[in-house]
Amino acid sequence: MTDLLLTHGYFLRDDEKERQIMKPYPPLGLLSLSAWLKTRGFGVEVYDSTFGSRDELAARLRAGSGVLGVYTNLMTRPAVLAIVAEAKRHRWQVVLGGPESANYPAEYLAAGADVVVI
């Protein structure tokens, strides 16, 4: 059973320069958090949006609700806000973490996030 879905707002399809270089990095922070949570008995799923699409993530959010954790940074702010809106449409509880949301918690809470980890 999945207690928590973790993702981030970076979609390689949206980054023309990175597509030319093609050296994206794995979401090590999300993977580390996932591993730690699993050792404590939580069911965790990681959706790596790097090679995914907004449509795939939206389909996953439509498939069932729960708790969604999203890593935030300045570059992914527009995508994260769209993810928050989509998740809330499908009754997910949204937890945000990372440098962007930690520096602007009020803005992210106003946009629909339930929790911002600082």
Task: Give, region by region, the residue ranges found by the protein language model.
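Glycine- and acidic-residue-enriched helix-capping/strand-helix junction motifs
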Residues: D15-L30
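Glycine-rich beta-alpha loop elements in corrinoid/cobalamin-binding modules
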Residues: G29, W36-I118
